Amino acid sequence: MKYLSYYGSRLFTLFFIAALVSLASAQDKTKLKAEDIWAKHIESIGSKDAIAAAVNRKIEGSATVRNLRVTKATVTGGAFLASAAGKQVTLMAFQTSNPGDYSGERINFDGKKLEITLVTASERSPTGTFIFQYPEISKGYIFGGTLFSSWSLLDAAKVSKFELQGKEKIDGVETYKMKFVPKGGTSLTIKMFFDATTFRHIRTEYTRTETAGTVRSDEGRLNENRYKLIEDFADFSKVNDLMLPTSYKVTYRFETAQRANEFEWSMKLTRFSFDSAREPEIFLQKVIP
């Protein structure tokens, strides 16, 4: 009996180990690859027909801009986004009291040329300056994410690299973190984050670190200038058969040897208009207000 009990126990252990190995193997087979996440993300937006029917888009809502570190001031106004056949525009207009106050932002890419308004006689806003210095953010059809019909992931020809780099939690949400490189390349490090359950695109981060060339006397190492632009997308809702974010936030922060600051644009989008044939008037008039 002891002999049978011993070998019965051994057999049970072997079967248990085999079951675990089989389960691990099955999990490996079902582990998602980058192309799977990409495909599921497109499915999360809507059907091919619904996406095609919304090639021309107008989106309106409210906007606020905040200086998060220095003045901590908040200004409110309106937001307008439009896209059509490789064109995209982001407009914000803010209520101001004085002629020299920050009155708004205009980021316009017509498929060839990127234009970003000056907010003073000779300067763009810090956020606008960063986007202008790295035009691939807009020209690569990354900026604005799924809000624009020209979103880079809807066209493989716009993508050079889409690489899975594991999982990461964003505000408590488990996401797939992807390294992204647009066609034509970039000197930025670009990460995209996709909800691990719904595969919705909820964040893009653009970072740039530069050696300042001066040595910190206390640490004996070179100073670095750090720049980071973050786009956050939230409050997804079904709009004309598409699942799109209705909250859109752009945060830009920088830290240099001389100073540091952080700015935030926040938009609540409430009115969506899609058309399969006619471009938004803002493109037909060829005048961007």
Model-derived features with residue positions:
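Bacterial N-terminal signal peptides
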Residues: 10-22
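A short, sequence-level motif marking secondary-structure junctions
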Residues: 76-80, 113, 131-133, 236-237, ...
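Flexible, processing/modification-adjacent segments and terminal tails
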Residues: 28-36, 43, 110-188, 212-227, ...
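N-terminal secretory signal peptides that target proteins for export/translocation
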Residues: 1-9
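N-terminal mature ectodomain segment of secretory-pathway/periplasmic proteins
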Residues: 29-30, 34-125, 158-166
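Gly/Pro-enriched, hydrophobic low-complexity segments
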Residues: 167-286
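Signal peptide processing junction and immediate N-terminal pro/mature segment
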Residues: 24-26
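Extended low-complexity acidic/polar segments
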Residues: 77-90, 94-96, 100-103, 252-256, ...
